[in-house]
């Protein structure tokens, strides 16, 4: 898992971050597309 995975997951689950914010973390290389799918529950699409 990426270093920020748990923190990003907790932000998303708490409603502090939207799906678009988590998606931006993938494009910035902070988390992987696979981690996005685990957090959001949807397939990552650019």
Model-derived segments and spans:
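Viral virion structural and adsorption modules
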Residues: 1-46
């Amino acid at each position: 898992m990426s270093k920020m995975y748990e923190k990003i997951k907790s932000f998303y689950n708490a409603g502090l971050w939207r799906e678009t914010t988590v998606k931006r973390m993938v494009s910035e290389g902070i988390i992987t597309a696979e981690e996005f799918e685990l957090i959001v529950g949807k397939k990552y699409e650019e």
